[in-house]
Structures are given as C-alpha cells and as structure tokens.
C-alpha cells in the first residue's frame, strides 16, 4: 500500500483561482461604464494609468482611503450587498471634494475567507454605481481570498481614491470668518458611521429590524440606505459661485468633531439643531438605546451629511445653486469668533432627553 502524499493544489488550500478570474470577467463591464477619457487601458494591468485632465495650470493631486466600518457586518447579517459599494465610494470621494477636488479614479480592496463570485460581483457593481455618481473611474482593485483569515464568505472592504484640484483654488477653511453662514445638505440616514453603536442598540432592543416600520419603510432599509455622494452638486456650487470657504463631510464624530477640522483657530460654529427635522431612524436609535443627546451628535450625523461655509452675503445664491442641482439645502448656523479654550461647535436647541 502506497503512503505517497497526495498532490495538493491551491484550491485544496482554499483559494480558487478560477473563481477570481470569473469575477474579473464579470466586473469588466462595470469598470468600463465608469471610464473617464484620461484613463489609459482597462482592467488587468499591473498598474492603472491616468492622465491629469486638461485645463489645469498647477494641478494638485488629493488622495484618500476609507472603509465602511461595521455597517458591513449588518450587510452580511441581512445578506444585502447591493449598496455597500456605493457606501465605500462615498466615504472616499466626499472626503476629497471638501477641499475642492474633482475625483479622478478609484480602486477597491475586497478580502474574504472564501470568494462568493455573485456577492463580490454585486458589491463591485455598487462600487461602479458610486463611481458613476461621483464622476470618477474604477481603474482597478484587489480581490484577496484568504482562508483562515475571515469566517467563511465574510468579507472586508477598503477604498482608495485620487482627485485633482487647481492649486490656487484649494478650499482649506483659511478664509472662514465671523458672520459666515453654514449651509447643510441632508444625509440619507446614518451613512457609514456609528454602526457599532447602532448594532449594540439593535441587540439591546431585541428588535427585528426587518419587521420594524418607520415612515412606512422597514428599519433595515433605513439603516442600509447608501451614503449620499455630494460630489457633483458641490463641484457645481464651487464652479458657479466661487463662494465656498470650507466644507466638512459629517462622518464618525458627527457635527461636533468634523466641523472643527476645517475651522481656523479663532472660529466657532454655532448650529441651530431646531433648523431641521431629524429623520425618524435617529429618534428610534436614541430612544431604544437611551442615548444622550450630545452623544448622538458626537457619533451620528443626525440627518446632516455635509456642511458648507460661505459668506452670509453669498448664502442665498449658494442655496439657489444647490437646489437647482437637486439638493435640499438649508442654513444650519453661523460662524462666530471664539477664544482659544472655547468649544469649537455649539449646538443650540438640543432636545431634552
């Protein structure tokens, strides 16, 4: 009887090369739909090539990377993978546009224990849809099948984006001054932040989020609503008015932590929380988790996805341009002068909870 060891393959070790190749074939069309004229070549090369768009005198490249946090765990639990790709793109491109940059190209990293081609193709299709909304090209990515690193078909995502801005037109908050107006753009829900708290609240409440209805929609759908991509309306606002002094993408840390990132040292944002109706999903989360009002604004966006600073004299024009671009903006507050030790963001009219 032979004791010869059987011949092992990569597939025996848990890595299916054929599945990886099948995925690449399925997503080629997705990438092609996002192609910008500056992109040279398609998927499959060792590196992706992209020219700087014409018309820039002193182009500055802007880069960013992000993930979607534990919203991904919720997506896996619900077996809902069609919009998480848009979340990934949004988290990256919204960070780029706040300095005035136009997103050029995007790459993704998809890591999994066992590659499910259908799930991965659905995720990448969502990434492609996000790239189309942002006007950037999906130029490549990495699909890593890593048995033993992830449980079964669980996966993780990361995104990487590069954009370009004219050096003289970089928006950095340095011109912000007392009296300026703050304009808000609505979020679609929690976007991609605060999901560790959200998942804990769901656990503590014992709620079946697919059965709970808020405003006629299942809570699961409200929690999985894709992160809004603000790129096109904001670039339109910048181009048409030249009035934007600063922008803050309201992500993890909420209004309290994100607005100060774009303010000069002596500036304070005074926000009127009563200026908008908070979406019902946030009220449900606060009630079920007995979450303190300040904590809500430090963890969640509470209905505000982007804040824009313009001179008060430009506020009406900015609101007009944003409405014409399909947005529903409103004035959320103003800038005041403050001392070195003052709170950088003051929230007025907080609800008593």
Swiss-Prot record:
EC number(s) recorded for this UniProt protein: 6.3.3.1
Catalysis: reaction(s): 2-formamido-N(1)-(5-O-phospho-beta-D-ribosyl)acetamidine + ATP = 5-amino-1-(5-phospho-beta-D-ribosyl)imidazole + ADP + phosphate + H(+)
Entry keyword Cytoplasm: yes
Class of enzymatic activity (EC top level): ligase
Pfam families found in the cross-reference section: AIRS, AIRS_C
Taxonomic superkingdom: Bacteria
GO MF annotation list: ATP binding; phosphoribosylamine-glycine ligase activity; phosphoribosylformylglycinamidine cyclo-ligase activity
S-S bridge residues: none
InterPro entries assigned to the protein according to its UniProt record, in alphabetical order: PurM-like_C_dom (IPR010918), PurM-like_C_sf (IPR036676), PurM-like_N (IPR016188), PurM-like_N_sf (IPR036921), PurM_cligase (IPR004733)
Methyltransferase keyword on record: no
Gene Ontology BP term (one): 'de novo' IMP biosynthetic process
Associated pathway: Purine metabolism; IMP biosynthesis via de novo pathway; 5-amino-1-(5-phospho-D-ribosyl)imidazole from N(2)-formyl-N(1)-(5-phospho-D-ribosyl)glycinamide: step 2/2
Subcellular location: Cytoplasm
HAMAP family registered for this protein in UniProt: AIRS
UniProt xrefs under NCBIfam families: purM
Family membership: Belongs to the AIR synthase family.
Full protein name: Phosphoribosylformylglycinamidine cyclo-ligase
